[in-house]
């Protein structure tokens, strides 16, 4: 696979309505009383793809994800609904010097959404939580360097949203209306002439089925 020079990226973990039939060859796990599964790179590559402008490649236990030149962003979406508490755990490496990670929790009617945004800059990193475009919380104490794997945990427990990087809570907030029947995914967005790319591994997803 041809890999371009990567200068910037946006990663979006998204919640959308709808569900598709998907069978994974995965290991059953339990975390904080919630059943879950370890998702291999091969099974992750079977998730719903949003566009033909998306390039993926299984590299051992890792999945390489890249958008094509001229793309306006691509998404890899878990094709089943998630209701109630969940834990989305994985290791992520950006292949860029700057970028953003966004986690979106949207209800199944689409009338509101929460966005947890991590902005990766050369000088500092900023975490923000948005609700329907309004900033509700901001924090500045975390590290997210390119070409380094970080363990990320995105968790919803009751009305609480939490985001951890390498075991440290980066930002958290309380939802007024927790989203139901959401589907998690990963979206990357670069510049038109400089496509975004990431590598992801050790994915685990926990929720009450």
Language model features: what each stretch is:
Residues 74-80, 103, 138-144, 174, ...:
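Beta-strand-rich interaction surfaces with strong enrichment in secreted/lumenal proteins
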Residues 6-20:
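Hydrophobic membrane-insertion alpha-helices, especially the h-region
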Residues 90, 148-165:
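Short tryptophan-centered beta-strand motifs in secreted/extracellular beta-sheet-rich domains
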Residues 22-53:
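Extracellular carbohydrate-recognition regions
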Residues 22-28, 67-127:
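Secretory/extracellular carbohydrate-interaction modules
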Residues 42-63, 67, 72, 112-113:
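Extracellular glycan-recognition surfaces and repeat-rich motifs
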Residues 173-202:
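Flexible glycan-contacting loops in extracellular carbohydrate-active proteins
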């Amino acid at each position: 696979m041809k890999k371009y020079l990567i200068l910037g990226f946006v990663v979006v973990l998204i919640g959308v309505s709808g569900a598709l039939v998907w069978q994974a060859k995965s290991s059953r796990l339990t975390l904080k009383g919630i059943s879950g599964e370890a998702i291999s790179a091969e099974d992750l590559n079977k998730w719903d793809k949003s566009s033909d402008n998306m390039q993926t490649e299984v590299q051992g236990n890792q999945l390489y994800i890249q958008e094509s030149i001229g793309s306006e962003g691509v998404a890899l979406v878990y094709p089943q609904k998630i209701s109630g508490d969940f834990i989305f755990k994985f290791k992520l490496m950006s292949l860029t010097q700057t970028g953003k990670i966004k986690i979106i929790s949207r209800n199944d009617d689409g009338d509101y959404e929460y966005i947890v945004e991590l902005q990766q800059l050369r000088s500092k990193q900023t975490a923000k939580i948005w609700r329907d475009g309004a900033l509700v919380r901001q924090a500045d104490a975390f590290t997210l360097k390119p070409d380094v794997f970080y363990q990320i945990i995105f968790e919803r427990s009751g009305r609480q949203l939490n985001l951890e990087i390498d075991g440290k809570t980066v930002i958290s907030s309380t939802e007024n209306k927790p989203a139901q029947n959401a589907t998690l995914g990963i979206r990357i967005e670069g510049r038109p002439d400089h496509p975004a790319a990431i590598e992801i591994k050790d994915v685990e997803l926990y929720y009450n089925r």
